[in-house]
């Protein structure tokens, strides 16, 4: 059984998600200790538990240590099965982070996998559902990944209530070298149970800030009724994105500007992928082989994901500084 120190590097939930996904792919049983050891509230939270439970269901794994606050788990997979699964994370637990825990394994499933997931689609400290759909999936398609998601309903913190359907087919991943895409910025600004002018103001503020920086954009707006109150905006171009969520007392103009200010440094750098996508791509690139990208900043999430991935797979990542950017490659 492979022993993984859960406090290594970034030491958060992502390390656990990547380790479990690659355990499923390789069939290697694992024991992860010191999970979220240095966090204010160490151990597993509800959304981590639901992700691990889902991964265990899909690959018929034996799993122990699955309880709130647990700092150690063991996970022994059998085989990755297909089929249909209904998952309710509860409240506003992140749907996108749950998917991160299982998506790297799904190309190796025996048959197609269909998921219906309830939870949070737009919550803090996780990719928005629009980011996953328009940035992450676009990048994964280049690596031969076969999957899609359909947003049924937005769900915001703290009530959640979002709903997503997802569909994945077994596939063979292929190598790809990511280059900067040249096109206009697109976006989606949305709000539920709020005045219709809220998403409009978010979009207008983002467009204005982007144009001041020299980047034209086309941002769609949506206003609707849903289970929870909230707003958000996501911007994307190629393999680069930026997003911001509304908060009580935060003007809509500030939300839009925050999203623009997140994507502008990424665009100015000339990197092929943004700093968030950079860490997400690591396990897929390792499974595909001979792939690369450039990124403006090497985050602790990325270096941690590289370390975890190299524990499971016979690959070696290389990091080189080139013209002010970091080139990350695997062979």
From Swiss-Prot:
It is found in: Cytoplasm. The keyword Chaperone does not apply. Keywords: ATP-binding, Cytoplasm, Ligase, Nucleotide-binding. SUPFAM superfamilies: EPT/RTPC-like, RNA 3'-terminal phosphate cyclase, RPTC, insert domain. Its main location: cytoplasm. The active site is at residue 301. One of its GO terms (cellular component) is cytoplasm. One of its GO terms (molecular function) is RNA-3'-phosphate cyclase activity. One of its GO terms (biological process) is RNA processing. Its EC number is 6.5.1.4. InterPro entries: RNA3'-term_phos_cycl_insert, RNA3'_phos_cyclase_dom, RNA3'_phos_cyclase_dom_sf, RNA3'_term_phos_cyc, RNA3'_term_phos_cyc_type_1, RNA3'_term_phos_cycl-like_CS, RNA3'P_cycl/enolpyr_Trfase_a/b, RPTC_insert. Gene3D superfamilies: RNA 3'-terminal phosphate cyclase domain (3.65.10.20), RNA 3'-terminal phosphate cyclase, insert domain (3.30.360.20). It comes from the Archaea. It catalyses: a 3'-end 3'-phospho-ribonucleotide-RNA + ATP = a 3'-end 2',3'-cyclophospho-ribonucleotide-RNA + AMP + diphosphate. The keyword Nucleotide-binding applies. ATP binds at residues 100, 276-280. Belongs to the RNA 3'-terminal cyclase family. Type 1 subfamily. NCBIfam families: RNA_3prim_cycl (TIGR03399). Catalyzes the conversion of 3'-phosphate to a 2',3'-cyclic phosphodiester at the end of RNA. The mechanism of action of the enzyme occurs in 3 steps: (A) adenylation of the enzyme by ATP; (B) transfer of adenylate to an RNA-N3'P to produce RNA-N3'PP5'A; (C) and attack of the adjacent 2'-hydroxyl on the 3'-phosphorus in the diester linkage to produce the cyclic end product. The biological role of this enzyme is unknown but it is likely to function in some aspects of cellular RNA processing. This is RNA 3'-terminal phosphate cyclase. It comes from Methanosarcina barkeri (strain Fusaro / DSM 804). The gene is rtcA.
């Amino acid at each position: 059984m492979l022993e993984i120190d859960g406090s290594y590097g970034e030491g958060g939930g992502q390390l656990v998600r990547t380790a479990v996904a690659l355990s499923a792919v390789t069939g290697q049983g694992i024991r992860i200790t010191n999970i979220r050891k240095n966090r204010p509230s160490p151990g597993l939270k509800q959304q981590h538990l639901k992700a691990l439970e889902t991964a265990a269901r899909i690959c018929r794994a034996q799993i122990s240590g699955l309880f709130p606050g647990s700092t150690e788990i063991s996970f022994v997979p059998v085989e990755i099965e297909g089929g249909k699964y209904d998952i309710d994370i509860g409240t506003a637990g992140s749907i996108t982070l749950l998917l991160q825990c299982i998506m790297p394994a799904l190309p190796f499933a025996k048959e197609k996998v269909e998921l219906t997931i309830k939870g949070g689609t737009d919550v803090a400290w996780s990719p928005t559902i629009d980011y996953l759909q328009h940035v992450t999936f676009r990048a994964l398609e280049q690596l031969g990944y076969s999957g899609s998601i359909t947003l049924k309903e937005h769900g915001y913190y703290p009530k959640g209530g979002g709903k997503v359907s997802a569909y994945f087919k077994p596939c063979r991943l292929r190598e790809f070298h990511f280059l900067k895409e040249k096109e206009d910025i697109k976006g989606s600004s949305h709000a539920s149970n709020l005045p219709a002018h809220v998403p409009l103001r978010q979009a207008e503020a983002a467009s204005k800030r982007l144009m001041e920086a020299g980047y034209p954009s086309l941002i769609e707006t949506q206003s609707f009724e849903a289970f929870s109150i909230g707003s958000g905006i996501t911007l994307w171009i190629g393999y680069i994105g930026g997003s911001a969520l509304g908060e009580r007392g935060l003007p809509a103009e500030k939300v839009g500007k925050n999203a623009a200010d997140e994507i502008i440094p990424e665009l100015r750098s000339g990197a092929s992928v943004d700093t968030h996508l950079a860490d997400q791509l690591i396990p897929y690139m390792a499974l595909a082989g001979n792939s690369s990208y450039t990124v403006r900043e090497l985050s602790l999430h990325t270096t941690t994901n590289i370390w975890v991935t190299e524990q499971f797979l016979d690959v070696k990542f290389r990091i080189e500084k080139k013209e002010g950017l970091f080139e990350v490659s695997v062979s």
